[in-house]
Amino acid sequence: MNLNLHFDKGTILIYGVEEGQLSQLDGVVWDERTLCYRTPAADYRQLVTTLREQKISFQDHARKFSAETFPLKKKITPRSFQQEAAEVWMSEQRGVVSLPTGAGKTILAVMLIEKTGRPTLIHVPTIDLMRQWKEVLSEYFDTPIGLLGGGINDIQAITVATYDSALIHVTHQGNQFGLLIFDECHHLPGEQYQFTALGSIAPFRLGLTATPERADGKEALLYELCGPLCYEIHIDELSGRTLAPYVVETIEVEMLPDDREQYEIARERYINFLRKARVSFNHPNGWSIFLRRTSESPEGREAFKAYLLQKKLSQASGAKIDRLWELIQLHQGDRMLVFTQDNEMAYRIGRIFLLPVLTHHTKLPEREAFLKAFRTGEYPILVTSKVLNEGVDVPDANVGVIVSGSGSIREHVQRLGRILRARPGKQAMLYELVSENTGELFTNQRRRKHRAYEGTAVLPNQSGQNYSEIN
């Protein structure tokens, strides 16, 4: 009796199994409801490979795709590292490729779509990126490019989907694509997004990211879902070649007296509570323990307010506004991106200097208008909280100022990447404004633990200094 494979809501149903045939496969379980064996759809490749190796005949009703050709309508001349990455990935047709922002991840994907020749679903985190991918794919392929997300449900042989929309549709579309591409694939191990990979039978998988590492250590799950990290190249290896040469400078800013006084009072209250409650952030669950302890008493709740206040004062010190103005004056004629940790500070800077501000609240038409004006030079400065951290193409930016940020290494590398797209004669500058003698210094040290920042300068508080002359 032949085995029969069927796709069912993100899983594979296996009928006609004889005793012991699938004993070596993890994840294959007996389902009393359907009276057959069942396994996650992501195990399709391993299942089919095992059946063929054991010369077990089977009928494949699960797969609803076949080989296709996607001829390129314009020639690609890959850079040497893109060619290397393509060759390494093609050897197994699974794996994660880590390239810096601006190094041509999308072009690499175009190359691999053409070489693989299977219906392809590309996952992206935002609607902006979905449209950006469609624009590039349409430039290289004659075939229609489908979209899934933002109210659009147009499935084609090459389709770009947001992670959210792909998740919604994977239970009934998980057998229609042979190649999955996960852009910004560090999102994939998220509690929900992982099911977009688990629920698909696609045997070929490509993860693309500038920073595969995750704060929660779930890289192992990423590699399980996509394949191993098969190729990696770093920002410093491409600086001055594929990417613009760059300098990163940390400027310690002395807080205004009133801000400093409030900061010290709030921080003392917060630190005293940590000691009294015996909370240590060196503990793996230190933050969770802190939140629990602060919720247990009025004193704890006051300590939490003090924590938020001292953090806000260090990140949004008025002295940083003064220093930002100096940098704006210094870099007249350049294209500058100003990054903040939160929307409040972004809008505050926008009001003070009459600058356009991009946040997640900015409507799409206004966002597109701001980005277009930035590219043409009508708006030489854009202020943003987090929406430009990831993916949005701003090739004309050559100066970045981080007024405030998290301790995330990924966020920091992404912000640097926003200003590194090469053009003739370009020299990129990234400034970090850090309040002197505050907890923000530790945050800065934590997020700089990446080779892209080795050897970069930390400048003392020197108002009026010509920073561009310091190396």
What are these regions (language model features)?
Residues N175-G178, A220, V383, E390-S406, ...:
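A short beta-strand element within the Helicase C-terminal
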Residues M1-E84:
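Accessory DNA-engaging acidic/polar modules
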Residues H186-V247, D258-E261, I265:
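Post-DEXD/H (motif II) to motif III coupling segment of the RecA-like Helicase ATP-binding lobe
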Residues E92-T116:
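Walker A/P-loop
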Residues V279, P284-K363, R367:
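Conserved helicase/translocase motor-coupling segment
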Residues R131, E135, P144-I155, R335-F339, ...:
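Conserved helicase ATPase core of P-loop NTP-dependent helicases/translocases
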Residues L99, T211-P212, S408-M429:
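Conserved SF2 helicase motif VI
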Residues R418-R446:
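Conserved segment of the helicase C-terminal RecA-like domain
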